[in-house]
Amino acid sequence: PSYAKSAKTLPLSKETVDGSPATGSSLAVANSKGYSIDQRYSPAGTIITEIKTGQILWDENSTVEWTPASMSKLMTIALTYDAIKEGKLSINTVVPVKERHARVSANSNLSNNKMQVGASYTVGELMELIAVPSSAAATYMLMDLLAPDIDTFVTMMNNKAKELGMVNTKYVNPIGVLNVLLGQDGPSGDPYADNYTSARDYACLCTYLVTNYPDLLNHTINANLVSKPGTIYEERFEGHNYSLPGEKYAFPGADGIKTGSARKGYNYSLTAKQGNTRMIEIVLGVSVWGDSSAESMRHLIGNSILEDAFAKYEYRKVLSAGKYSVKGKIIEVKEDFYDCVPKDYKPKFICDFKNKKLKLNISNRQYLNGFAEPSASFELIKTVA
């Protein structure tokens, strides 16, 4: 009887609410907000996910194969953070510039900073050079810390992609260009091969990075960079992620991650946090290389769909730990239950006594690889007569 008195009634529902991701045209969403963006800027693929659950909130051709371009360099950053976690190096490890790095930095086919033999950079400084000017030479300097040669490193990249469930991704080099453009510093194999991926796969990678290595945000939050200030190696760079703080299309709560542009168009990845809710956004394939307006258009489009996602969804507690009365039984939920839900949603639950699990009455939700629908475990305390 005392259990029954202290237990709250758990709101149940046999009917489910549709939780399918929003779909459609991101360009149309942007234009519905008052922009007049030409059809040629329609992205090849976009996705928005909530980071804690991996739930897909917006999906526009998210599995279409596309080149990540310079966003390829995020995988080098991921492997570097893995090595830091394993104790092989630290964010403050000093890396000297070698002749090869200076040669790569002089390759006019690549985004770069000027690397000079005699200079040295910490791992953290190299990450910032990758994040803002998208330095190929900085990428090579990190690669050379982690692998004996580029072919071995590319294998490491692909193994990590497989581990993260990036099923539509293949890397052929760490830079994100045709192999032939890397000259003598390129890998073996097809000289005209390029990396390919999908928006969904890059959401997996960005989710992994931001979740496991939030220090990354310290290196990607700034759109602009002064490298080696006050030294003979000082360089100043203006970045291209216009959704970051202080930029012309700054998005509320944005604090990383990276852009990438290639012959097939303009891409970017972004993470933003509002309240307790953090989202990941990937935009791939806006217009084509050389279209000077495309860098702006990708952010107007991306910001528009991200604004809608934050307006609709939040990550919040949907059930407190405690005792509940369910169908003549008393159950105890040991931990608070959190989920990503529409802001106007009033939680109702489906109770699985066989597996001792509670989940929300929301159907058709989709998740990134490696994630599953959230649930809460419970113990059966008593059957009330």
For each predicted feature, which ranges?
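Gram-positive cell-envelope targeting signals
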Residues: 1-4, 385
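Domain-terminus/edge residues, biased toward the C-terminal soluble/receptor-binding domains
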Residues: 190-385
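Active-site-adjacent loops and short helices of periplasmic peptidoglycan-processing enzymes
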Residues: 3-200, 210
